[in-house]
Amino acid sequence: MNVVKTDKKGRFSLPGFEKTRFISITTPAGFETQQFYLPVKENRKSYDFLLTESERTQPREHSFVQITDTEVTGGMGRWVTDLQQYVKNEKPAFLIHTGDICYEPGLKMHNQVVNAETMNCPVYYCIGNHDLVKGNYGEELYESIYGPTWYSFDIGNIHYVVTPIDHGDNPTDYTQRDVYNWLKNDLAMMKKDQSLILFNHDLFTPGDTFVFKADNEHILDFRTFNTKAQLYGHMHYNYVRNQNGIYTICTGTLDKGGIDHSPSSFREIKVDGNDNITTQLRYTFIEPQIAIVSPMNNQISAATGDRLPVSVNTYHAQAKTSHVSYILSDIENNQEIAKGNLISL
């Protein structure tokens, strides 16, 4: 609930809050930690966090991967390998799962397979409506495995904020007022020139105003915090909309496709040196493919002088295409005529 800055020696003191179950840190840009939160224990007087320097969380230009709604109650699938290899090859700054992990079996299983060690990058989670399960309160099991339902971290010049869904299969212990109070305190610590990206399992702020309203008296206008995007899942479809400079981005599932008939996919988001974002989907379950588009069999090519345009399509679920090489040979005697690398368009 309360948010404070450490002193020069890294020491801090937090006021109490009756619902406090975790002490968490906003991991600063240029650093990583194996655990950004610690459970609160009775009679414990200090909470210490170990930070290590990190080159991948420092650059203003960086990328991250979003997955969502894996709903792994029946077990994990081949998508895990595609995701793992893509992260290994493309080296995003972090991976985030925006909720619906799902139910007791999924909650207990998912973090054993998709975590910072198996993915070799920081991994974060949001709580979804199907992650609010039976217990003393809906988020109890989630918290015991994944930690707090709200937290933040910095990478490059972006302040990333994870927020909890406000509804689900079982009642939550947190309220929208609790979320507002923490958000207000957290955002107050942003640096003057920082930008903001928000995560939630569902659409956090509907409409073009980007206002979070806990009640009539407690309101946050995210446009005043240089917000660049809000990302979510829940709907099982792919959607990107630029709303007067702020992107609203919904991502479908990488294991079963979307209800909009979109293929199974996860999302990569790139942040440039001015904090502007671009995004593309990466499709799962696709083995390395290459197809010559032009010239085609039994067709006359559009050759000009000694130039022969060659066009190919390539794709692989586990990596982007780095280059395409070619060899041109005489069909009658198989003699090599030319070879080289094609230029990406």
Kindly give the residue locations of the regions a language model identified.
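N-terminal active-site segment of His-dependent metallophosphoesterases
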Residues: 22-109
